[in-house]
Amino acid sequence: MENILDLWNKALQKIETKLSKPSFETWMKSTKAHSLQGDTLTITAPNEFARDWLESRYLHLIADTIYELTGEELSIKFIIPQNQDEVEAMPKSPIKKMSKEDPVDIPQNMLNPKYTFDTFVIGSGNRFAHAASLAVAEAPAKAYNPLFIYGGVGLGKTHLMHAIGHYVIDHNPSAKVVYLSSEKFTNEFINSIRDNKAVDFRNRYRNVDVLLIDDIQFLAGKEQTQEEFFHTFNTLHEESKQIVISSDRPPKEIPTLEDRLRSRFEWGLITDITPPDLETRIAILRKKAKAEGLDIPNEVMLYIANQIDSNIRELEGALIRVVAYSSLINKDINADLAAEALKDIIPSSKPRVITIKDIQRIVGQQFNIRLEDFKAKKRTKSVAYPRQIAMYLSREMTDSSLPKIGEEFGGRDHTTVIHAHEKISKLMVEDEQLQQHVKEIKEQLK
């Protein structure tokens, strides 16, 4: 038999033609041939999650592909190289296909055609959520049910939910897939009660193969809607139908959510999405530019990625804003133009660090005393009072320690600084003129 590495590379090339691009890149691309002993081929998987999925879904595909290449029937074993946690791959029973009875037409605008696995940019903050979503899409109700995805606004939760819906329909056109927000679920439920159409409402959402419900946190506090969703959840789960839920927080942190619903959300897999790192943000911008047919210099994408670090929607929106601005003023896109285009949504610079000397300078101007007076031993009220105000502000507006503040005021003891802070704090409660002085000084410092 040929070299094991060459054999596995050929096998991967064949397998790639038999799988969708997202499936191949998520599950197969990171595998490696480990060893061939007797009639057992050992393959490494990057982690336990991938290993379990490979053995449950791709065992026969791999074995058949190896047979096509070699004419030999080999047993397949998967291991995790980090800890050599070997698991003998066992044949699994065929996965039952979803019901094709009573097909329901899915509204064309229900799933965004741009939100697919192919257009999703994978990074460290969403890799697990992406893999779990793909697993659910490939085997609805067999992998994780429910799948609960949570994370901040604009990080890709809705994208993954739509991608699951597209994948299921692409591979089973008669599948009944419904996507909606919890707000829409609530409104339709209320309308069904008002119009005496509760039965129709229940039939619509309890006779689907995949239910994708977004922003479940909005059910908090809505007791009747929670009751209805509880029974909808139970019906679908008992009939082995897939449920995918998204939220801006994990189930345990959703206020006024009934315990019985919370516990059901925790039956399956809970995965989060975190803000993308710099490399992922740049990759997102590149993919967006390519999709829109835009030629954007690398320096511009790096600039935008450095300025917007938490929200993918804002990131993509910033790119479009730069392109639009370039078109309006008829100038080439570069980093300077990007900075000009985004000046209203990106601070021109980080807030400046306020120093004790800055405070002394502004207080001195307000009370007409010299900088050296702050360090002098003078105890006249005309000097001591502004000095105490400056000490108060140094404590409030800088990160300097008490000894450091005392040092900047002529080597005074830290207890003097504490006394000054307490005195000015008390005086400000009673003295409106002092309040105004301090307010003006703070404004000038900022």
Curated annotation (Swiss-Prot):
Q: Where in the cell is it found?
A: Cytoplasm
Quick one: where's region Domain II?
Answer: 72-109
- Domain of life, per lineage: Bacteria
Summarize where ATP binds, as residue positions.
Answer: 154, 156-158
Q: Name one GO biological process term.
A: regulation of DNA replication
Chain positions covered by the region annotation Domain IV, binds dsDNA: 327-446
Annotated Pfam families:
Bac_DnaA, Bac_DnaA_C, DnaA_N
The record's region (Domain III, AAA+ region) falls at 110-326
For this protein, the record's SMART domains field holds: AAA, Bac_DnaA_C
Q: Where is this region: Domain I, interacts with DnaA modulators?
A: 1-72
- List UniProt keywords, sorted A-Z: ATP-binding, Cytoplasm, DNA replication, DNA-binding, Lipid-binding, Nucleotide-binding
Any single GO CC term annotated in Swiss-Prot or TrEMBL for this entry: plasma membrane
Looking up PROSITE patterns in the UniProt record yields: DNAA
List the InterPro entries hit by this protein, alphabetically: AAA+_ATPase, Chromosome_initiator_DnaA, Chromosome_initiator_DnaA-like, Chromosome_initiator_DnaA_CS, DnaA_C, DnaA_dom, DnaA_N_dom, DnaA_N_sf
MF (Gene Ontology): ATP binding; ATP hydrolysis activity; DNA replication origin binding; lipid binding
Family, as annotated: Belongs to the DnaA family.
Q: How does it assemble?
A: Oligomerizes as a right-handed, spiral filament on DNA at oriC.
**How does the entry describe the domains?**
Domain I is involved in oligomerization and binding regulators, domain II is flexibile and of varying length in different bacteria, domain III forms the AAA+ region, while domain IV binds dsDNA.
Q: What does this protein do, in the record's words?
A: Plays an essential role in the initiation and regulation of chromosomal replication. ATP-DnaA binds to the origin of replication (oriC) to initiate formation of the DNA replication initiation complex once per cell cycle. Binds the DnaA box (a 9 base pair repeat at the origin) and separates the double-stranded (ds)DNA. Forms a right-handed helical filament on oriC DNA; dsDNA binds to the exterior of the filament while single-stranded (ss)DNA is stabiized in the filament's interior.
Q: What is this protein called?
A: Chromosomal replication initiator protein DnaA
Organism whose genome encodes this protein: Bacillus pumilus (strain SAFR-032)
- Which taxonomic lineage is given here? Bacteria, Bacillati, Bacillota, Bacilli, Bacillales
